[in-house]
Design a protein with these regions (language model features):
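Sec-dependent N-terminal signal peptides
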Residues: 12-14
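His/Met- and acidic-residue-enriched segments that coordinate or traffic transition-metal cofactors
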Residues: 2-9, 18-178
């Protein structure tokens, strides 16, 4: 009974923490440097989750997914940093990027406390929720508020990768035992 309540609380907390478009019940207003910070932070957070999975999971599908997340998100980080440098755009910390980092610390603690199949389920459930939220934020907040055409184009190019990650995570989620 306790495990079910804990998992339910984790899922509810995770969903509410990553509901960035609902941030403070209104869409946050972000400058391009703040958008760059949110994009970098979101990718760094998912790399951190993937590294936990690579250390804790024994499931080949989870391990392969985590490897893909690390590779893809580190690639996006490198591209974002190169773009920021080319545009002379210094990412600026803001309420959204700070909230992402704070929420990630809580999620990492929760993931680190799990083992075996409970870990695999918690990790992949988090990945599904996280990617849904990040996609919604990129589509509903970051792209519409980007002033710089190259930054906007970069975000638009990253979107299909995020959607592929979501599809992959959803497929793995459907294959895990309930």
């Amino acid at each position: 009974m306790k495990t079910g309540k804990t998992l339910r609380a984790f899922i509810i907390a995770t969903f509410s923490l990553y509901a960035i478009p609902l941030f403070a019940q209104k869409t946050p207003s972000l400058s391009d440097p703040e958008i760059a910070s949110v994009a970098l932070t979101a990718n760094q957070v998912d790399v951190a989750y993937a590294k936990i999975a690579q250390e804790k999971s024994k499931d080949p599908n989870i391990l392969e997914f985590a490897k893909t997340m690390t590779k893809d998100h580190e690639g996006v980080i490198a591209q974002a940093e190169a773009l920021a440098q080319r545009l002379s755009l210094t990412p600026k910390d803001n309420a959204v990027s700070k909230q992402l980092n704070n929420d990630a610390e809580e999620t990492k603690k929760t993931l680190n406390a799990k083992t075996d199949k409970d870990f695999d389920r918690a990790y992949i459930d988090n990945e599904v929720t996280y990617h849904k939220s990040v996609i919604a934020t990129v589509e509903g907040v970051l792209i519409p508020q980007s002033k710089d055409a190259e930054l906007k184009q970069f975000l638009q190019q990253v979107l299909p990768v995020l959607k592929t990650h979501l599809d992959h995570a959803t497929m793995i989620q459907s294959q895990l035992p309930k």
